[in-house]
């Protein structure tokens, strides 16, 4: 056994011997293990930080050193032992002879030697480097050599035995004699063996100890890491647990609310289903009844129509026959009388001649026949001739004359008879054709109506659209409707008689002149006599038309009672089928009107204006026209009918071209030919009714009631010189076309007068054409609706007659007719210049009236087809048709090319380019990097004296800055860049050049923005949507107007040098604040971290980069915000940065920022001067210059300026940041969290519980930025302040009246009840919590304009404010009857009015989605104040019966004001009220701003007043009351001002800020015991949903601060709407004036636009292309 052990030991020694290497070299020398092995496990435990790796390496190094130390100690001990053993061996060798060593002893010695060697080898292997190995290169490096000096040589024991245990040696005598030494040797050997065993044991123990220690250390480090991870997880889980607990409570509350809402909805659904069933049944019954009525009505209508047609036809026939017979009889009687008279004269003349001849024959004196005395008249001085005295007579001439006259009379009688007969035939034929055409059209109309469906059919049966009776079929009044059919062959001289110029007129007039009947084959159904009817060129070639009447004759269709006809009978409403009398197609005063076969000067009075519809022809006295050469002095413009201007459709009158005709005076309509001729001549002996010159008005045409009621053309034409005229009354005079000078000029000159372009819309008459006279027959259906004339013919009685709209076919001919009319005459050109002014797109369509019966003109589309109209080159009307857009073009100057060279007008050109280039060029010192947020940051030039930021109102306040005090505000949103301030750039010498970098895209190019005093070509303000432009001092307005960069609360980082810029107070002249423009891409401005970049002092730069994006300017207010320039510290800000920031903050001067809030002139953004308190969320205007604080109220932030980021960007940011952050913020971060900058992106609070008390006690910051350093500013709180606050909160929570439908809230903060305000996305001002209830900084004592209370929130002032707000008097003497003591008596009147109710315009709901539509209907609204219920019905319930209509109602949960740009129906207020109720929204609009305010005030007050259900809590201070007096955290229900105008003024308050996103809401406190509101008690429903979702989403990123789910707590609407007076005309204007007066000593608001109406900061934060961006302020 011992041998085997020795063998094993030897084998182990061979294996483990470091000096022995196998010949194959399979083992490498363990040189790498000189030190302790590297513990890879230690580094596998998430050595994610350099510090952890460093700790691992240090541990490894210490371990290695320890092991080296222990190895050295062991080696030393072993060497000493070896020396001792060698000494003893020598002694043994010396004493060998003295004692005999036995085999056993020798064996032990050999074993001891072997073990010694093994120990030495192991020791050497463990502690010695390989280089210390002995041996040569022969491959036996480790084997014992024969060297005697080798410690491994067996000869070491030579003194005790032979060289080899196997060597046979004879012991010396001395050894043998000294046998007693053997025992000593054995003893020594045993000792050595035991020692070696102990050494080996100790070595093994040491190795085990080392292994154990290493394992323990590794385990310890691993456990430490795990413990740290577990601690973080536990901390996170604790936070999540609290959040989940609150969330669960909130969700449970919501579940109950939703269950109640579902129950309500189910009930409503049941009711609605039943209502729907009833309505459906009612509807079906009504439809059946309606169908029955329709059928019955249709049958009756058809019967009636048939009967009426038959009656009309019969009556027409009878009247026609009667009138024809009467006219023929009268005519023949007149002719007979004429003939008798002529015959009597002739007989007298013959008898006289016979007597003379007899007398001559009785005389004996015979005169020679050739005597000249026959040719001489009796001398004047001769005595009167005696009967027997011979007086020379021209008997022959008289005889010939009488014979000629008699022949002419016979011929005339024959012609008239043939004409009468012929026209009778033609009229009968035409009437038949017309009747057939009407029948066919009626049939077609019925067919088309039937095809169109029941809607059109039903509409057709309405009274206003029913086909009117046609008086033209009744016989008497048809004389001007008659179509004269001219047969060119019936009279041989027709061709000679017709004026030659009429052919051209016909060619032009073809479209308008020809009756519609001739246009379509459909109307030639039964006529075989097409040839006898007029052809295109025959119109004025014949003499049968009434133009040739002499007054004693009457046309066949004329009746004796024509003078008694009423206007309706005469000017009948005709369908387009009525043929136009050819007389209407003749030019006014055409030669043909005088060319009568038997006219005498006495008969010419009857020649009426051929173009007039004969109303005046038969009604005006027939004066004898006094022939003058001046009669034709003025000729009616071509195509101008007497009624044309005023009777044209309103659509034409409203067109821009009407300006051509408006300023010309014209004779009134309806004048006779005499009147019009007299009007032209103007002599005192002219005939006709007096002229009344009425300016043509664009209103619907007015007709004078009498027969003279037609108004001549409104255009007075400038004609060529008066043509020479001769008396043309005698038939025998040769027709001289030259006398009628206008005959040729009618086409060229007269026609060139600007015809009112509107008239082309008349399709059937020639009015739109170049006929110089008034149109023939005007179809009332297309032109005007004639009214019955009054008996008197006074021209003063004017009726407004609606004109029908343009017909479908009118549009087809419109262009052609217009082309003909417009010449290039100077008059026309002068008139055309106005067209650009008429850029008004007055849509003439709107005035169309229902009376226009366009349905009847089915067939009239064919009319324009026939004769092509030659278009004269003068035609210039086409631009009029496109007038609507053309005027804009002339107005727009050619846009100057945007060049970097400064062009004052160009404000847009360089916006795009502006982005970064100007900054680089201007950087004076490269030291601090400028981060240009992709686009906006403009490097400001230091010398820009104006706070170049929107220098709009920059009253240059002299900057008192020290150059080192530049405060740089960097939005964290641009993470990469060191402070991107233009501040450094400001030192650049280009003093005046204010960067276009503010490139605000919408900056109105109004004023050339900057004057570059240097030649530096400043890029013209590039209006890139965001930059606030730094303007030089002079340009107060310039580019800022549209700058949409709404500085999202830029956090100003104060350099340590940032000195008290306070002195700059009143001077905002600090040069360009280059606003760090983040591009519209919303670089997310999460709380900007302080950058330590050293900025070269720019003496005047106050704050440079305000990172703001896209704030379309809304009303500008010059308010100044004084910011203490707090550093924006994130939770993760390193301590060193925090320290430097704190120091910088103390030294940094407050920034004075122009307030950007919309409605308040001064109050909103400003800080009260004493305390510097500022609107926590108010956007910092880029021009803010540090300056002395000025007293002003601080605004609550109603909408976060942080809303620049979209939700996707925010989520991405959070994900990116989550990976880098520690899971839980260190405790030191809580301090940062408490003092987070108001401008930092709001962070979702990770643990609500520790700050539970703070939730309800949010402090009002001492100044806009004081929140960042609130911990340092305020006096220390007592050590147990949190416990005290928690106890107080708990007490107040317990005292709240319990809601019956809600579960008991958790003992956590009231956030569970109020939709957990802790977790909802916060406005920046919420990020700073004040710990402690005694917020008694002196700076808070200034007046609070927002909440109408002082800013002090101590217990006493809080109580007094409660008394003031809620009228809490300990023992109120009385309360208004019917109202609780909490009712503001000033609101009772408004509430009473709403109780009584009125008609408002309610938006309907879409049938499918139930969303609010764009249409409104009128409903009667009233309110029940106690139940807070809004009722409405179709009728006034006071006057309507019980059966009339149903009343609907909703419970009023909240009311908001929304901007409303819906133009229909016109005349309503520009804002609507939206009442939020469980499950739906009701939106309605008041008629005036006063009514709007009354309703909004009353509804708001009802929601916020103390109702009976919560009166018991009135005198108790609850968490809601505490929140009430913390401006940023008032409960939503009280977020709107409750005071009437008088009360708000009496308390010296300012108006609340105007809405930012387009709506304002009042919310009712949901403490009604029996109702579980589906909306969170103090939040909008949509916000509650988003807030809860954001809470859920952020629970998983619990330690990531800065997540917020929406763009601001009130993104839906600004609750600080100027509640009681939010319309433009209200008291706010006065406040604006007062505030402006207060602000004269302050900075100009360089971010204002629109003359101060808007301010960039308060504009919508959404993208400029989002639908809501321009709701409130459609800027530019």
Curated annotation (Swiss-Prot):
Residues 1393-1504 form the PH domain. It is found in: Membrane. SUPFAM superfamilies: PH domain-like. Residues 1-35, 160-180, 353-394, 439-712, 1027-1050, 1176-1201, 1220-1270, 1297-1354, 1511-1589, 1654-1676 are annotated as: Disordered. Residues 51-127, 193-359, 408-453 form a coiled coil. GO terms for biological process: conidium formation; maintenance of protein location in cell cortex; microtubule cytoskeleton organization; nuclear migration; nucleus localization. Residues 1-11, 609-620, 647-664, 1191-1201, 1314-1341, 1534-1548, 1580-1589 have a biased composition (Polar residues). Keywords: Coiled coil, Membrane. The keyword Coiled coil applies. This is Anucleate primary sterigmata protein A. The lineage of its organism: Eukaryota, Fungi, Dikarya, Ascomycota, Pezizomycotina. The gene is apsA.
